[in-house]
């Protein structure tokens, strides 16, 4: 800031501007946080009617506030964590984040199920005494993975019992098994005549909150049965 001063002891209507030479105060050099003496510098008298008694003071440099704001992150259930990054504001005097921060990393609350997990300051800190660090957290959001269920095509002969309605599963994560996250079974459109009958999701459902289920149907095809006709042997007299 401008180095200013107060004047006392003027006589006979004199003004400071008339008896002082207009020189400026100076201060001890330095830009880091600390206390720096304010010196008389070039300030002096132009009047022979006074002796100048200068009393110094201090310029105190206090810490600047360095703001670190964590970036919000997302990942799909079962995927690896993204890098936990942040934005920095409040740098002064050409300082860089790399020069004033210790390079420590942010951390997040542990957990791999779908949900929100707080991103915390972790080991991130300052190596510069010129700042106070204000950390603002954010969240890593784990979203649901897509579980694909594709019904197997089936056939049966007219009049036979239905085959088991089976399916293929893809998209499992984190060592999950279909048996641990799915309940219920498929069903098919009613009918026993020859034709094509859609295989539906039925009551097949998820019991895990970590997935969305995408079902793709198929068909049960009833084919014709073979009807055997065997003529009876016959005889007659000539």
Regions found by a protein language model. Give the residues of each.
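Solvent-exposed beta-strand/loop surfaces, strongest in extracytoplasmic domains of secreted
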Residues: 1-238
């Amino acid at each position: 800031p401008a180095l200013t001063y107060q004047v006392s002891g003027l006589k006979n209507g004199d003004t400071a501007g008339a008896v002082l030479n207009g020189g400026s105060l100076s201060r001890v050099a330095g830009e880091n946080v600390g206390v720096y003496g304010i010196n008389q510098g070039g300030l002096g008298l132009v009047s022979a009617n006074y002796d100048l008694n200068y009393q110094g003071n201090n310029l105190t440099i206090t810490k600047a506030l360095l703001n670190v704001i964590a970036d919000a992150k997302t990942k799909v259930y079962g995927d690896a964590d993204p890098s936990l990054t942040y934005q920095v504001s409040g740098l002064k005097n050409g300082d860089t984040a790399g020069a004033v921060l210790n390079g420590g990393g942010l951390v997040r609350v542990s957990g791999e199920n779908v949900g929100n997990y707080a991103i915390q300051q972790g080991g991130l800190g300052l190596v510069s005494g010129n700042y106070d660090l204000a950390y603002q957290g954010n969240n890593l959001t784990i979203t649901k993975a897509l579980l694909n269920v594709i019904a197997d095509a089936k056939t049966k002969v007219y009049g036979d019992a239905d085959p088991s309605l089976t399916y293929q599963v893809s998209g499992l994560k984190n060592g999950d098994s279909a048996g641990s996250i799915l309940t219920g079974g498929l069903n098919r459109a009613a009918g026993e005549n020859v034709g094509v009958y859609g295989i539906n999701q039925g009551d097949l459902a998820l019991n895990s909150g970590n997935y969305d289920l995408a079902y793709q149907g198929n068909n049960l095809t009833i084919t014709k049965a073979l009807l055997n006709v065997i003529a009876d042997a016959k005889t007659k007299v000539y």
